[in-house]
């Protein structure tokens, strides 16, 4: 109900037992200002000995909501007074017909609760005037917010919240996204997200027990992040316990997600994990498989298993028993594959537990289940088991004391070596399974992991694991088998001499113009790349120029070629290298005739040019006694000619693609001769010339002209 003004209180009489109000004209010294306390509600009691019809009745109580933050200083300084009963009739006595209307006027002045929406990461967004703000920082009781479109649109909108107050600092450079905001609000109203886990089904507007739950004051409509649904066995069965848990869960909603007690939300369903073929773990959530990405503290980050296959961007974060899914999936869950993995997990656990001995019914039914082949191709799911002969050999190794059956002898004769392996040209091994070739990746204990040989070339994701004589294939191939290449490897395996190619005297090598070595094999030239132990690795000489990917490996006198060439051999260049090899004077200059001294010319920057056959070379580098030169027109004309000098010897590597610049060479030679002519002149004459060149015109008139000085100098 409205309070009387201070001016009206001065003229009214006070209640017995209170000090009289000061008279008009008297100075009133207010008390020291105090920090106003925040009261959610003020209760005003009116004492009256009359009932509704004037007969005595109990005092009535009227609840009025006041926000002391919005009140003025006069209201805060004044004291709430209770008027005497005699004067209450027309002033203080509330109208019983409309108590709610008078209270609503005060409610309108009170600040409304701020609206918050949850983010997929468990945070919250502030909603002000249909704009979304994300939290930037918090200093004391102030929370600073910036526009959600700050990074995308460069919006500089800012807001500061303090309690229930919100202050907007800067305007926005864009219109509010009404549709996106409404979509977020609709998402907030989903029944599955209304309450945290462990509270059973949502109960609508009425709480447990039929009571209407009042909304929490000062708490926006943001909920906790998505939680896993509780199992039916964990739902509370007694209604009394549900009535006790519901208010506590509602009170937890007023806390930020990081400060909510996990114990207060009840126990969650344990997470489901499945083992990967590499010994890792898959997270199973809503029939989707997630593979582990990283762990930060107690949080583990997961990505969808089909991220690379379908480009799915779904992510999940686990913290203890809580799961938060960040984005939705762009595909349907693979129910058949998930069920196959679950069966495989159960079978492996049963076999490892060893509850039933070998040869029992369970062992017969689950034999080889750990080698299930899970094919993720476009066709239906196929589950196959290894051949009985492989299992029989494992039993022979594990139980050597048991007698062997005749059929087991036949199986061993049919497959005496287990899985088929072929040697690679580098000395490694290929696994052959169903006409597909697998390259060894790593070994962990008794297990050896293999990848498809065409993984890099065709992006095949098929994997295989061998454990003893057992083979487990993880994924199907995206290509048909290379029967021709497989047959070539088998033929090479049968004829080892073909792998040890080369002449009886060893491989042929030719010296490079720079002093290195070329490997010659089948008229192709290979450049040395690196050496590892006894093996030397070579690459095709035309790799950079023609993109040839052929490789060769030499080990002693053995030569192994990895890939074919994409070009014919350069017979002319090979013959030129062989001719140079036969004439050592071209490379070493060991002729008995005296060597002619090399010609050098100075550059304008103080360097040197090498002159050879009227061509100019610029110095590139020096290594020991050798100096390497490149053609001066390399940048201008793209000439690739090179030269090497060692003492007075010179060796040219490549020919020039242009004619020599005779005019430029002659100009450089003339410039080389000019300083010698100038040095032969009189030094005093040179100094006088330089002095007169730098003198002012007035000085030149006094001392004469430059020509006169030259004449005088010549006459002297």
UniProtKB/Swiss-Prot annotation:
It comes from the Eukaryota. It holds the Pfam family FLYWCH. Residues 1-35, 191-231, 377-421 are annotated as: Disordered. Keywords: Centromere, Chromosome, DNA damage, DNA-binding, Isopeptide bond, Metal-binding, Nucleus, Phosphoprotein, Repeat, Transcription, Transcription regulation, Ubl conjugation, Zinc, Zinc-finger. Residues 195-204 have a biased composition (Low complexity). Induction: Up-regulated by ultraviolet (UV) light (at protein level). The modification Phosphoserine is found at residues 21, 261, 371, 503, 591, 696. The keyword Transcription regulation applies. It is found in: Nucleus; Chromosome, Centromere. Gene3D superfamilies: 2.20.25.240. GO terms for cellular component: cytosol; nuclear body; nucleoplasm; pericentric heterochromatin; transcription regulator complex. Transmembrane segments: none annotated. GO terms for molecular function: DNA binding; transcription coactivator binding; transcription corepressor activity; zinc ion binding. Its main location: nucleus. A zinc finger (FLYWCH-type) spans 116-174, 273-331, 421-479, 509-567, 600-658. There is a cross-link at residues 134, 393, 685 (Glycyl lysine isopeptide (Lys-Gly) (interchain with G-Cter in SUMO2)). Signal peptide: none annotated. GO terms for biological process: DNA damage response; negative regulation of transcription by RNA polymerase II. Interacts with CTNNB1 (when unphosphorylated), perhaps preventing interaction of CTNNB1 with TCF4, and thereby regulating transcription activation; phosphorylation of CTNNB1 may inhibit the interaction. Transcription cofactor. Negatively regulates transcription activation by catenin beta-1 CTNNB1, perhaps acting by competing with TCF4 for CTNNB1 binding. May play a role in DNA-damage response signaling. Binds specifically to DNA sequences at peri-centromeric chromatin loci. This is FLYWCH-type zinc finger-containing protein 1. It comes from Homo sapiens. The gene is FLYWCH1.
């Amino acid at each position: 109900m409205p309070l009387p003004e201070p001016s009206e209180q001065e003229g009214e009489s006070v209640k017995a037992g209170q000090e009289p109000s000061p008279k008009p004209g008297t100075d009133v010294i207010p008390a020291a200002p105090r920090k106003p306390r925040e009261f959610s509600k003020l209760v005003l009691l009116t004492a009256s000995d009359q009932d509704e019809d004037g007969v005595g009745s109990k005092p009535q109580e009227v609840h009025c909501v006041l926000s002391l933050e919005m009140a003025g200083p006069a209201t805060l300084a004044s004291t709430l007074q209770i008027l005497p009963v005699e004067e209450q009739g027309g002033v203080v006595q509330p109208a019983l017909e409309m108590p709610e209307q008078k209270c609503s006027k005060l409610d309108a002045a009170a600040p409304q609760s701020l609206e918050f929406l949850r983010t997929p990461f468990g945070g919250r967004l502030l909603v002000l005037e249909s704009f979304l703000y994300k939290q930037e920082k918090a200093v004391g009781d102030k929370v600073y917010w910036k526009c959600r479109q700050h990074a995308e649109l460069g919006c500089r909108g800012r807001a500061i919240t303090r309690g229930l107050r919100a202050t907007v600092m800067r305007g926005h450079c864009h219109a509010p996204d009404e549709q996106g905001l409404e979509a977020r609000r609709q998402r907030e109203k989903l029944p599955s997200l209304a309450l945290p886990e462990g509270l059973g089904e949502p109960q609508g507007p009425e709480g447990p027990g039929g009571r209407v739950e009042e909304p929490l004051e000062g708490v926006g409509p943001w909920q906790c992040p998505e939680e896993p649904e509780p199992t039916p066995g964990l739902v509370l069965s007694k209604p009394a316990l549900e009535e006790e848990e519901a208010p506590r869960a509602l009170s937890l909603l007023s806390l930020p997600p990081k400060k909510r007690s996990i114990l207060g939300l009840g126990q969650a369903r344990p997470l489901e994990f499945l083992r990967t073929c590499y010994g890792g773990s898959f997270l199973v959530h809503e029939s989707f498989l997630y593979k582990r990405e990283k762990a930060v503290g107690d949080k583990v980050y997961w990505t969808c298993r089909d991220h690379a296959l379908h480009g799915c961007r779904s992510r999940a974060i686990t913290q203890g028993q809580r799961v938060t899914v960040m984005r939705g999936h762009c595909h349907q869950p693979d129910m058949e594959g998930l069920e196959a993995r679950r069966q495989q997990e159960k079978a492996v656990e049963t076999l490892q537990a060893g509850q039933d001995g070998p040869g029992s019914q369970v062992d017969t039914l689950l034999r080889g289940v750990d080698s299930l082949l899970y094919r993720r191709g476009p066709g239906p799911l196929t589950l196959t088991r290894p051949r009985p002969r492989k299992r029989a050999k494992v039993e022979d190794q594990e139980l050597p004391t048991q007698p062997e059956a005749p059929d087991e002898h036949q199986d061993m004769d049919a497959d005496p070596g287990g899985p088929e392996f072929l040697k690679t040209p580098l000395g490694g091994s290929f696994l052959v399974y169903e006409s597909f070739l697998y390259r060894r990746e790593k070994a962990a204990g008794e297990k050896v992991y293999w990848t498809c040989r065409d993984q890099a070339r065709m992006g095949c994701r098929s994997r295989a694991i061998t454990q003893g004589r057992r083979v487990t294939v993880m994924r199907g191939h995206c290509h048909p088998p290379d029967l021709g290449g497989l047959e070539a490897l088998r033929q090479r395996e049968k004829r080892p001499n073909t792998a040890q190619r080369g002449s009886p005297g060893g491989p042929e090598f030719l010296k490079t113009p720079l002093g290195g070595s070329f490997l010659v094999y089948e008229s192709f030239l290979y450049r040395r790349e690196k050496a590892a132990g006894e093996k030397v690795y070579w690459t095709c000489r035309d790799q950079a120029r023609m993109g040839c990917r052929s490789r060769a490996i030499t080990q002693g006198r053995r030569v192994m070629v990895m890939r074919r060439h994409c070009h014919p051999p350069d017979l002319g260049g090979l013959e030129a290298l062989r001719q140079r090899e036969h004439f050592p004077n071209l490379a070493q200059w060991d002729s008995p005739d005296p060597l002619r001294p090399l010609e050098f010319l100075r550059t304008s920057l103080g360097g040197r040019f090498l002159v050879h056959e009227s061509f100019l070379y610029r110095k590139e580098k020096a290594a020991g006694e050798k100096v390497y030169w490149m053609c001066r027109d390399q940048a201008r004309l793209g000439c690739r000619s090179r030269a090497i000098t060692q003492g007075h010897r010179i060796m040219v590597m490549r020919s020039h693609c242009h004619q020599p610049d005779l005019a430029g060479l002659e100009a450089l030679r003339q410039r080389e001769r000019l300083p010698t002519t100038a040095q032969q002149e009189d030094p005093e004459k040179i100094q006088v010339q330089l002095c007169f060149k730098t003198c002012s015109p007035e000085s030149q008139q006094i001392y004469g002209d430059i020509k006169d000085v030259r004449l005088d100098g010549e006459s002297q």
